[in-house]
Amino acid sequence: MDEVARTAAEVMLTTPARHPPSATVDEIRDFFRDDHVHAALIVSPAGYLQAVVERDDIAGCPAPDTAVAPLGRLEGRTVPAGASLAEVHRAMIATGRRRAAVTSADGQLLGLLCLKASRTGFCSERDVRARTEARPTVLS
């Protein structure tokens, strides 16, 4: 992958799961049951990213009905759409982060960068679709 000239917007997943500001700790814990999920994106009805919540943010929270948004943060978890993919890749490896929300200049959520477990590149829409289709269906 030629990351030098590419931007975050060119590689981001464009339809990441979004959670409303009313999402609770318990709801996000349930979302994190999927081991491929590393971050929950809390997004206002107008599309503005309010928080990025990671597992460690809620690990010690004893109140399952607590609103989750105040437990997350944006700093260090977002990148601008025009950011150099090579620079973002280096920063994610240096910090150990595998997810970064991609935002517009005014804070709207545009997408999500998902660093592969191999750390050699980013997941594509096709990768995510294939993984979803390969999951067994649970019948109740």
Where are these regions (language model features)?
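Tandem CBS (Bateman) regulatory domains
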Residues: 1-15, 49-97, 105-140
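Acidic (E/D-rich), amphipathic helical modules within compact regulatory domains
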Residues: 17-61, 69
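Sensor-regulatory modules in signal-transduction proteins
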Residues: 42, 102-103
